[in-house]
């Protein structure tokens, strides 16, 4: 006997400046959907320019959720996001709309789809050893090993998804508790949603050029004024949100510690590095379908229509 069908959600992911927001709005219009933000910085009020929030036109065209829900001095963890996003998704589905989750914060997306488990001490060393064994033995052998200690979890994992295989083995060996049991006890099913993940593929040089243009545009449209207003409102440079890319460098400039030229170069460099880290994270997930946008929009739309049918 099978259980109830899992709710279906579409995920749009990829590095910063790849065009996720624009694609999500186009898809929402075509699919009668609503958008759930999964960018950890766009959560914060008053941080609009430096986080490249959707434009007024984009937000007016399609309902958006989880934008501007916390002040910059309020931490908003992956667990907080998972809870808030789940509520938003439930509301979207009740209204007969299709949920489209868009963002580049990989940990937020992982928390939403699979829940979070705190890493016990010693996890890093064990993870490295398991990764070495996977290189020697192959993914299938590691999946079979997981099946022996956590068969429920193993049935939900594709052999190519080495990240989840190793995570399951890691938790079991360090705690003696199958990850599937932990997830169940803490309110997370092995799978919470049926998801289709579309990643926007951009050639590296083109991505870096987009980043350069975006940073120039942010500075030209008032990033420094935005940061100054936040500081004057009492949100100090020591806050985690104010240490994020664009804001940290702007705080240093406003304090007289760097020139405008140096500030611009630093924001561009740090954004490129962040994009590389995002790609490393998302490339480790074999379930993501990578397609170019806007070139492959018709193909993306076909995938989405088939998924929701």
Curated annotation (Swiss-Prot):
Xref: SUPFAM superfamilies: P-loop containing nucleoside triphosphate hydrolases
Gene3D superfamilies per UniProt: 1.10.20.140, P-loop containing nucleotide triphosphate hydrolases (3.40.50.300)
Catalytic activity: adenosine(37) in tRNA + dimethylallyl diphosphate = N(6)-dimethylallyladenosine(37) in tRNA + diphosphate
Domain of life: Bacteria
GO BP term (any one): tRNA modification
Binding site for substrate: 16-21
Presence of the UniProt keyword tRNA processing in the record: yes
Function: Catalyzes the transfer of a dimethylallyl group onto the adenine at position 37 in tRNAs that read codons beginning with uridine, leading to the formation of N6-(dimethylallyl)adenosine (i(6)A).
Name of the protein: tRNA dimethylallyltransferase 1
Source organism per UniProt: Pelobacter propionicus (strain DSM 2379 / NBRC 103807 / OttBd1)
Species classification: Bacteria, Pseudomonadati, Thermodesulfobacteriota, Desulfuromonadia, Desulfuromonadales
């Amino acid at each position: 006997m099978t259980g109830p069908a899992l709710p279906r959600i579409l995920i749009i992911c990829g590095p910063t400046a790849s065009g996720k927001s624009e694609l999500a709005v186009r898809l929402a219009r075509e699919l009668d959907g609503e958008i759930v933000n999964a960018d950890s910085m766009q959560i914060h009020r008053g941080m609009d320019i430096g986080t490249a929030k959707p434009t007024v036109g984009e937000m007016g065209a399609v309902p958006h959720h989880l934008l501007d829900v916390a002040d910059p001095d309020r931490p908003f963890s992956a667990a907080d996001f998972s809870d808030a996003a789940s509520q938003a998704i439930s509301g979207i589905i009740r209204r007969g709309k299709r949920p489209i989750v868009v963002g580049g914060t990989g940990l937020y997306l992982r928390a939403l789809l699979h829940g979070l488990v705190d890493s016990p001490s010693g996890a890093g060393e064990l993870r490295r050893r398991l990764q070495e064994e996977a290189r020697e033995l192959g993914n299938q052998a590691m999946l079979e090993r997981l099946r022996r200690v956590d068969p429920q979890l193993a049935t939900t994992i594709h052999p190519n998804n080495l990240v989840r295989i190793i995570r399951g083995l890691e938790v079991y060996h360090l705690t003696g508790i199958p990850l599937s049991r932990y997830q169940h006890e803490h309110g997370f099913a092995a799978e919470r949603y049926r998801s289709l993940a579309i990643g926007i593929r951009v050639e590296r040089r083109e991505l870096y050029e987009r980043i350069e243009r975006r940073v120039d545009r942010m500075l030209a449209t008032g990033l420094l004024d935005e940061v100054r207003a936040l500081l004057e409102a009492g949100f100090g440079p020591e806050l985690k949100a104010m240490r994020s890319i664009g804001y940290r460098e702007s705080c240093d400039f406003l304090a007289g510690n760097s020139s405008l030229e140096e500030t611009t170069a630093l924001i561009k460099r740090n954004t490129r590095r962040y994009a590389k880290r995002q790609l490393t994270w998302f490339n480790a997930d074999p379930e993501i379908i990578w397609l170019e946008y806007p070139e492959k929009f018709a193909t993306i739309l076909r995938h989405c229509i088939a998924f929701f049918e």
